[in-house]
Amino acid sequence: MELLKPNRSVLGSGPGPGASLCRSGGPLLNGSGTGNLSCEPPRIRGAGTRELELAIRVTLYAVIFLMSVGGNVLIIVVLGLSRRLRTVTNAFLLSLAVSDLLLAVACMPFTLLPNLMGTFIFGTVVCKAVSYFMGVSVSVSTLSLVAIALERYSAICRPLQARVWQTRSHAARVIVATWMLSGLLMVPYPVYTAVQPAGPRVLQCMHRWPSARVRQTWSVLLLLLLFFVPGVVMAVAYGLISRELYLGLRFDGDSDSESQSRVGSQGGLPGGTGQGPAQANGRCRSETRLAGEDGDGCYVQLPRSRPALEMSALTAPTPGPGSGTRPAQAKLLAKKRVVRMLLVIVVLFFLCWLPVYSANTWRAFDGPGAHRALSGAPISFIHLLTYASACVNPLVYCFMHRRFRQACLDTCTRCCPRPPRARPRPLPDEDPPTPSIASLSRLSYTTISTLGPG
């Protein structure tokens, strides 16, 4: 990926600590295709303003870096240790966490440190490696989001067809193909990346494309393959998912109202063997418990064997005034949470990456104009948006998941177990405690219930 460079107006003028070059930085901050430096004259600012801007920038970088590393490491550990979370969707989430962790580790330090030091000190090998790994991580993140969108669309809208191929082995093959495709797509980065002198004792890691036409073609290609096409696929997939959920919600509400009126008219248990929503209209139906806990699952309701009648079932219950509407309201709340999470996913994807791709495309076709318009605070804000994408994905995909939160608590409890409480020992002249009448009656009831009649 390429981004415009912040100029000296951000942190002050002149090389050294607390200053940045007009086109210096890590692989995200690449120089022009021709290699010519076009620095703007530094704006005169007070020392207090420069120190405040530097402190704010370093603080934001540090917070985003810690959240990205900590959140993605937690996801990898929890998904790797918890057997209950080893599902197809979570396999893609694990790949997404690895790519986001790679983006944070391979990009942020090598972007911030050269800007603070005024030169790139890590050498040509690190320059090429960081540029390549950064591009691969961005590509894997985008393709992982697309894979998750397609997997959820298949699970919710096409459950019968998805059961044939929706396995963990198939997910593993898709993940491997995603990483291999991203690795091949980003080969031009290490080829055309090098460390170039930008002044006396000043080096910078930058791209040197053969011509302006090659650079423009590459920018448009990335804009289509890693932004527009994935964005359209995600928007269509999540739009169809939202439509399916709301249609199923309306059908469930009609079914509950009809069932309630039938029970009220008969004055007893509803009879008959009517078809469920999944059999009536061929759509997928989400159970309240699954939708409330997972938020991404769906199942086809299969006929189950009717349990034996109990004594409480012999008496026909009288339907309450809100017995039919409460399940519908619970499903409404659960499905609204699902749709809300899907909309957040799409909005954050466009929010974090639209400025980056727009700036790169603009710079490829009009470098001087883009540099004059975006240098300074705008490009710094764009940088923070791209880096924030590595820490918002864990929040959106995993911390809105109840089972993941419970797995986090279980993992923390396992890593930091509480010391067992010491039981008080009875005194030598003290009799041992005798079970009370309530304990004996509970024990007798448990024994009788366990043994059963006969």
Curated annotation (Swiss-Prot):
The keyword Mitochondrion does not apply. Residues 265-275 have a biased composition (Gly residues). PROSITE patterns: G_PROTEIN_RECEP_F1_1, G_PROTEIN_RECEP_F1_2. GO terms for molecular function: cholecystokinin receptor activity; gastrin receptor activity; neuropeptide receptor activity. Residues 80-87, 151-170, 243-340, 402-454 are cytoplasmic. Keywords: Cell membrane, Disulfide bond, G-protein coupled receptor, Glycoprotein, Lipoprotein, Membrane, Palmitate, Receptor, Transducer, Transmembrane, Transmembrane helix. The keyword Ubl conjugation does not apply. Residues 1-57, 110-131, 190-219, 363-380 are extracellular. The chain crosses the membrane at residues 58-79, 88-109, 132-150, 171-189, 220-242, 341-362, 381-401. GO terms for biological process: neuropeptide signaling pathway; phospholipase C-activating G protein-coupled receptor signaling pathway; positive regulation of cell population proliferation; positive regulation of cytosolic calcium ion concentration. It is found in: Cell membrane. It holds the Pfam family 7tm_1. Glycans are attached at N7, N30, N36. GO terms for cellular component: plasma membrane. Its main location: membrane. A lipid is attached at C415 (S-palmitoyl cysteine). Residues 257-284, 422-441 are annotated as: Disordered. Disulfide bonds join C127-C205. It is a multi-pass membrane protein. Receptor for gastrin and cholecystokinin. The CCK-B receptors occur throughout the central nervous system where they modulate anxiety, analgesia, arousal, and neuroleptic activity. This receptor mediates its action by association with G proteins that activate a phosphatidylinositol-calcium second messenger system. Belongs to the G-protein coupled receptor 1 family. This is Gastrin/cholecystokinin type B receptor. It comes from Bos taurus (Bovine). The gene is CCKBR.
